[in-house]
A protein has these predicted regions:
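Long, well-ordered alpha/beta core segments of mature domains
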Residues: 1-294
Length: 294
């Protein structure tokens, strides 16, 4: 830009160290597969890392691996105990491969999805790791979500419309309505929910459209249970089946979201559901990769 550009790092610019593109990605994958992390742990950690991105000011995201630093490592939504367990396993893998932890977190999420889909998930290396000294903790406090519909998380200390916050989060991530829908349905089908609410599948290790199939099943009658959640009862057997949140049920009550949910719930949309989930997932993982041209 010119000879007078300052050489020092400016903390308000959220600096990130230069990443490494030259390492064996397949070797990293093999090491992750060999560890005892579950699909849910890997996918949820990768989502937690990348989903802080805000298209409005281009802050947050997976680059920098600031999920291992304060304040993000202590956010309730990130399940600090589970997060530290996952990071303790991924750190030595990253160090041995010469990769950044930021890259390895995303690779682990992709490994989880590859286990759940049997398909190859696109990946672009080159993320760097930030240090605590490069991170203005106070400025990152405002990125903490009061709700994350994708993980069925709500901070009970705030009063808000959960569906509106869901739309706000999707907009911050730059997602379209179909992308938001397929990501939420896919995350639930993988058993990812902060408190277990909204898990409507019997096989959480397979990425499927089960969530929307069960949600829209006319045999299920949903009733409030007093804690902001809803219980389904089978009309045919009278048996209580599933518990869901307001965010889950808005995909049945809102006409536009229901249209999307019905499309993905179709028997002939199973492959389309998986393909669209992979595209939307990759979009979020790469949201802050301003160094990528394609």
């Amino acid at each position: 830009i010119g000879p007078e550009v300052p050489e020092e790092e400016l903390i308000w610019q959220d600096p990130v160290s230069v990443g490494n593109n030259n390492y064996d990605i397949n070797a990293v994958k093999q090491k992750i597969v060999a560890c005892d992390l579950t699909i849910q742990q890997m996918v949820e950690t990768a989502w937690a890392s990348a989903s802080t991105y805000r298209e409005t000011d281009m802050r947050g995201g997976a680059n920098g691996a600031r999920i291992q630093l304060a304040p993000q490592k202590d956010w309730e939504v990130n399940k600090p105990n589970q997060l530290e367990t996952v990071l303790d396993i991924l750190r030595p893998i990253a160090a041995e491969a010469g990769a950044s932890l930021a890259d390895v977190i995303v690779i682990a999420g992709n490994v989880g999805l590859e286990k759940a889909t049997g398909q190859l998930i696109p990946f672009k290396p080159g993320r760097g790791d930030a240090t605590q000294e490069q991170t203005d903790s106070a400025s990152f406090d405002v990125l903490e979500p009061i709700a994350d519909a994708f993980r069925n998380y709500e901070n009970k200390n705030f009063a808000y419309n959960a569906a509106e916050v869901m739309l706000d989060k999707a907009q911050l991530l730059g997602l379209t309505a179909p992308e938001m829908t397929v990501l939420i349905g896919g995350m639930r089908s993988l058993g990812i929910s902060f408190d277990g609410t909204g898990i409507l599948t019997d096989n959480p290790n397979i990425l499927s459209n089960d969530h929307f199939e069960k949600l829209l099943d006319s045999d299920n009658e949903w009733s409030p249970v007093g804690d902001g959640t809803y219980q389904s009862t089978s009309r045919s057997s009278g048996k209580s089946n599933f518990k869901a949140s307001k965010v889950d049920l808005v995909f049945g009550s809102n006409s536009q979201l229901r249209a999307l949910a019905e499309f993905y719930a179709q028997n002939d949309s199973k492959d389309k559901f998986v393909a669209d989930f992979i595209l939307a997932w990759t979009k979020v993982m790469n949201a802050d990769r301003f160094d990528l041209t394609t």
